[in-house]
Amino acid sequence: MIIPRTGIGVDVHAFAAEGEARQLWVGGLLWPGERGLAGHSDGDPVAHAAADALFSAAGIGDLGTHFGTDRPEFAGASGVTLLAEAARIVRAAGFEIGNIAVQFVANRPKFGPRREESQQVLSDAAGAPVSVTATTSDGLGFTGRGEGISAVATALVYPRLSESIG
């Protein structure tokens, strides 16, 4: 019997300092005119949480293990690139990806009008269905004060049949 595995991933980024030239990337999409997020890579909390959830589900570390700040080759990397690489690593470890679900918490950007576009970009990167939802924290905490964005993701993976026998 093949038993699926679930994982959870979390990512949080503060908005970059005023005047710092950083673009906002959320859900694999560029949000022109919005203040960017601070981070080692592009700071996309949605893509990063999705990648982290994949690693968690496969039991092979986390985002920092694979793409940490000690890895200069990932400085400025796109979240979509990191998600695609995470999916490749998880598959190389003997797993297939069932799906990924992500919820991000922020006052901005307004996500609804671009939800389908984001889901397509992330699904293409992961090679599996990715759904994204957005909410606010009703003015509470750092996201409510507009200081940054957080995201939580779950992933479902299952071992390849050939990997689970014997």
From Swiss-Prot:
EC number of the protein: 4.6.1.12
Pathway: Isoprenoid biosynthesis; isopentenyl diphosphate biosynthesis via DXP pathway; isopentenyl diphosphate from 1-deoxy-D-xylulose 5-phosphate: step 4/6
UniProt keywords, alphabetically: Isoprene biosynthesis, Lyase, Metal-binding
Residue sites binding 4-CDP-2-C-methyl-D-erythritol 2-phosphate per the record: D11, V12, H13, H40, S41, D62, L63, G64, T135, T136, S137, D138, F142, R145
InterPro entries hit by this protein: MECDP_synthase, MECDP_synthase_CS, MECDP_synthase_sf
Record: residues binding a divalent metal cation: D11, H13, H48
Cofactor remark: Binds 1 divalent metal cation per subunit.
Cofactor(s) required for function per UniProt: a divalent metal cation
Claim: Lyase is one of the keywords in the record: yes
Function comment: Involved in the biosynthesis of isopentenyl diphosphate (IPP) and dimethylallyl diphosphate (DMAPP), two major building blocks of isoprenoid compounds. Catalyzes the conversion of 4-diphosphocytidyl-2-C-methyl-D-erythritol 2-phosphate (CDP-ME2P) to 2-C-methyl-D-erythritol 2,4-cyclodiphosphate (ME-CPP) with a corresponding release of cytidine 5-monophosphate (CMP).
Complex formation: Homotrimer.
Protein name per its UniProtKB record: 2-C-methyl-D-erythritol 2,4-cyclodiphosphate synthase
Species per Swiss-Prot/TrEMBL record: Pseudarthrobacter chlorophenolicus (strain ATCC 700700 / DSM 12829 / CIP 107037 / JCM 12360 / KCTC 9906 / NCIMB 13794 / A6)
Gene: ispF
